[in-house]
Amino acid sequence: MPRSQINGNFIDKTFSIVANILLRIIPTTSGEKEAFTYYRDGMSAQSEGNYAEALQNYYEATRLEIDPYDRSYILYNIGLIHTSNGEHTKALEYYFRALERNPFLPQAFNNMAVICHYRGEQAIRQGDSEIAEAWSDQAAEYWKQAISLTPGNYIEAHNWLKITGRFE
């Protein structure tokens, strides 16, 4: 049974109903409809913390989805799951892939910056200031890109850039 038929959450049910209506009235191919169904089920599983199921749905959605813009969001969500699982290298890979298809995803730049900042902090704890500086510089570049796409957002990152002298 598709996940959309078993959701107990009111918001998920509402989203599923609206999505099903849109799929019926918007002219799309059967492959696009199937890709969206997997994507929707992936989002539902992800919101419930069922990451293995979400990944399975997202991988199937990427196999079917041909639109680069839509693929970017699928890849971004895969990156989110890998971030949540502490698989930062994989997460960075999926954020990069998402940005290749859609360079206007500030949230992907932000998440990449957070990972780089975290790695910089780890390097500081390990006493490797050179590596820490490199990771922090990379975090700064990603945060600058996120901020340039959505000025007014990422206030904490903006402040960190100023405090560390990386804001230009």
From Swiss-Prot:
It comes from Piper cenocladum (Ant piper). Essential for the assembly of the photosystem I (PSI) complex. May act as a chaperone-like factor to guide the assembly of the PSI subunits. It comes from the Eukaryota. Pfam families: TPR_1. It is a peripheral membrane protein. GO terms for cellular component: chloroplast thylakoid membrane. SMART domains: TPR (SM00028). PROSITE patterns: TPR, TPR_REGION. Belongs to the Ycf3 family. The keyword Thylakoid applies. The gene is ycf3. Keywords: Chloroplast, Membrane, Photosynthesis, Plastid, Repeat, Thylakoid, TPR repeat. GO terms for biological process: photosynthesis. TPR repeats lie at residues 35-68, 72-105, 120-153. It is found in: Plastid, Chloroplast thylakoid membrane. This is Photosystem I assembly protein Ycf3.
